[in-house]
């Protein structure tokens, strides 16, 4: 299996990050087999499109919640990486566990 799991919808609370907020998070490598997708459907035209990264962020967005890493945006990029036999993906990772822990301590 390419991903750790596939589910429909976000199990974590809304984080409210804008694209500008996401752009401030530096990309890092994430193993594909550690990701759980939150989308069950992939638009084949986005997967095959040469300019699918023309709009939006060049890096997928992932969220860690309760120790699990969820792929929030960029499923087509992750599948494309897997089709090229890559095991990792560069993505922006929001650690909601750390944000929640920090808020609880404040």
What is each residue range found by the language model?
Residues 3-5, 27-32, 36-38, 83, ...:
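Hydrophobic transmembrane signal anchors and adjacent membrane-proximal interface regions, especially
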Residues 1-21:
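N-terminal leader/domain-start detector
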Residues 15-70, 82:
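Short alpha-helix boundary/capping and kink motifs at helix termini
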Residues 56-106:
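A short, basic-hydrophobic beta/loop patch
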């Amino acid at each position: 299996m390419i991903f750790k799991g596939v589910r429909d919808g976000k199990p974590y609370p809304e984080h409210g990050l804008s694209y500008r907020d996401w752009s401030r998070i530096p990309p890092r490598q994430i193993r594909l087999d550690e990701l759980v997708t939150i989308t069950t459907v992939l638009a084949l035209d986005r997967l095959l499109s040469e300019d699918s990264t023309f709009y939006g962020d060049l890096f997928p967005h992932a969220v860690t919640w309760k120790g699990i890493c969820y792929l929030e945006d960029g499923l087509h990029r992750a599948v494309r990486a897997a089709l090229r036999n890559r095991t990792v993906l560069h993505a922006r990772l929001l650690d909601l566990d750390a944000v929640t822990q920090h808020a609880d301590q404040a």
